[in-house]
Amino acid sequence: MSAAERMDVFALLAPKRPDHVSLGKALTLFVEREDFGFVWIAFDDNESIVGCVLVSFAISTDAGGLVACLDDIVVFPGARRTGVGTGLLETLATHVRAMDIVGIRTSVPRAFGLESFFSACGFSVRDDQGFTRTLA
């Protein structure tokens, strides 16, 4: 992620994150410490950002290995229901599976109304706080 892309991702996430200082620090860590996680950005045909995912890594005693923590998935309203989010999650699953990561977890609350979206992408409800996808 370049410095310019970092600012674009910040602008995409900032409306839902009141603590802009913490968001800025987290995005800086994603740039400086790729071993901690990564940010993927989805572009449209005009090279405009239409969405992104932020993923960090954690050791899970429940899963018995390393899991990818989907910290955020954001798709611009005009790009929703066009396959951007599904594409991001499917690419994520393929990528982290190749890294021997055993699952993907998210803390996206069920209250956000995304249960059918995550279910269609192979996730199951983990608890009231999120969803999980086991990778074989």
Predicted regions mapped to residue ranges:
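Residues at secondary-structure transition points
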Residues: 61-65, 83, 109
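Conserved acetyl-CoA-binding loop-helix of GNAT-fold acetyltransferases
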Residues: 75, 81-94, 120
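Conserved beta-strand-loop-alpha-helix junction that forms the acyl-donor binding cleft
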Residues: 80, 105-115, 132-136
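Conserved GNAT acetyl-CoA-binding A-motif
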Residues: 89, 96-109
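Conserved acetyl-CoA-binding loop of GNAT-fold acetyltransferases
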Residues: 118-128
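Residue-level recognition of the GNAT/N-acetyltransferase active site
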Residues: 58, 76, 109
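Acetyl-CoA-dependent GNAT
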Residues: 4-65, 71, 134
